[in-house]
């Protein structure tokens, strides 16, 4: 019955919000890099074999762009007027890379070469080598490189775009009778768990910061002497409350407890009723014997 009392005292509150990692800065500078097979644009159909080229790379400090605004990424003119090919390489943080070739003879960005949907779309018959983004979203967070092939060499300009979103935090809180509950996370990242005592109850609160919002579920494991719980939450749904589910569990346990207590009460009542009945029969039997003895 003591364990049942602890179960009745159990209350769980769990909620989830979303957190995006802080912005970071890269170094600005220029350097020469020889051609490498591992470079994403070293395709034979774009750069013929045996051609010695010089790479000039300019790394731009990351730019923070708010969600929902319109953006335009510029591909600056090359030192030479003989720019025959320009290619945008888009590498979102949570998507595979995508290429957008700009053909000088066509004066428009050709059909994109992508391995996954969800990347930047270019309007049909776009007459500029600049890359427009109609409405910035979290999926546009990543690196954008404009690569130019000229008679003087190959030039590349890089943009690092950061799209801050809402806070991405997962919190699991449990309130129960002593001893304190144990809370574990999967996956376990940057988590801090604190507990405090209030009268005969213990409040345990665990908070985890997620560096990436990949949409995968986060599991909170809650362990107590009375029972164990496994709660699943999805990061990409924003604020989520599973209190109705927990209330359903508590209602079921309360109903079971009431049935057990009621059954025990009726059993005890039947026991005392039977004992009283036997006692009354014995008293009546003894009284009859006394009356017979008195008459005899």
UniProtKB/Swiss-Prot annotation:
Cellular component GO terms held in the UniProt record: external side of plasma membrane
Biological processes annotated in GO: regulation of neuroinflammatory response
Residue numbers on the Cytoplasmic membrane side: 267-296
GO molecular function: signaling receptor activity
Glycosylated residues (UniProt): 167, 199
Extracellular compartment spans: 26-245
Transmembrane segments: 246-266
Subcellular location: Membrane
The Ig-like V-type domain, residue ranges: 48-162
Protein topology in the membrane: Single-pass type I membrane protein
Superkingdom as given in the UniProt entry: Eukaryota
Tissue specificity as recorded in UniProt: Expressed in uterus and bone marrow-derived mast cells (at protein level). Expressed in uterus, spleen, bone marrow-derived dendritic, basophil and mast cells. Expressed in the lung of N.brasiliensis-infected mice. Weakly expressed in brain, testis, lung and thymus.
Main location as per UniProt: membrane
Domain Ig-like C2-type positions: 151-232
Keyword line: Disulfide bond, Glycoprotein, Immunoglobulin domain, Membrane, Repeat, Signal, Transmembrane, Transmembrane helix
Signal peptide start and end residues: 1-25
S-S pairs: 75-146, 172-220
Protein purpose: According to PubMed:15187158 isoform 4 is a receptor for the CD200 cell surface glycoprotein. According to PubMed:16081818 isoform 4 is not a receptor for the CD200/OX2 cell surface glycoprotein. Isoform 1, isoform 2 and isoform 3 are involved in the recruitment or surface expression of the TYROBP receptor. Isoform 6, isoform 7 and isoform 8 are not involved in the recruitment or surface expression of the TYROBP receptor.
Homology family: Belongs to the CD200R family.
Subunit structure: Isoform 3 interacts with TYROBP. Isoform 8 does not interact with TYROBP.
Protein name (record): Cell surface glycoprotein CD200 receptor 3
Encoding gene, per UniProt annotation: Cd200r3
């Amino acid at each position: 019955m003591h364990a049942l009392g602890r179960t009745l005292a159990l209350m769980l509150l769990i909620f989830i919000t979303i957190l995006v990692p802080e912005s970071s800065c890269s170094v600005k500078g220029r350097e020469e890099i020889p051609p490498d097979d591992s470079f994403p644009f070293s395709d034979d159909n774009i750069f013929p074999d045996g051609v010695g080229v010089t790479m000039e790379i300019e790394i731009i400090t990351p730019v923070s762009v708010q969600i929902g605004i319109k953006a335009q990424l510029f591909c600056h003119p090359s030192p030479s007027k003989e720019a025959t090919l320009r290619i945008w390489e888009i590498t979102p943080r949570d998507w595979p890379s995508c290429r957008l070739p700009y053909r000088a003879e066509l004066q428009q960005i050709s059909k994109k070469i992508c391995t996954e949907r969800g990347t930047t779309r270019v309007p049909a018959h776009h007459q500029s080598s600049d890359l427009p983004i109609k409405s910035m979203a979290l999926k546009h967070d990543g690196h954008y490189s404009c690569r130019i092939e000229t008679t003087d060499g190959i030039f590349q300009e890089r943009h690092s775009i950061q799209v801050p979103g809402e806070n991405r935090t997962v919190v699991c809180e449990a309130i129960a009778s002593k001893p304190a509950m144990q809370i574990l996370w999967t996956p376990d990242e940057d988590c801090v768990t604190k507990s405090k005592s209030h009268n005969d109850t213990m409040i345990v609160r665990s908070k985890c910061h997620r560096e990436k919002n990949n949409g995968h579920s986060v599991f909170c494991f809650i362990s107590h002497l009375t029972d164990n719980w496994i709660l699943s939450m999805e990061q990409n749904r924003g604020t989520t409350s599973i209190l109705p589910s927990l209330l359903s569990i508590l209602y079921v346990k309360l109903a079971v407890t009431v049935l057990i207590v009621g059954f025990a009460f009726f059993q005890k009542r039947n026991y005392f009723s039977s004992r009283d009945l036997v006692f009354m029969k014995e008293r009546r039997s003894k009284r009859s014997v006394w009356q017979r003895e008195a008459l005899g």
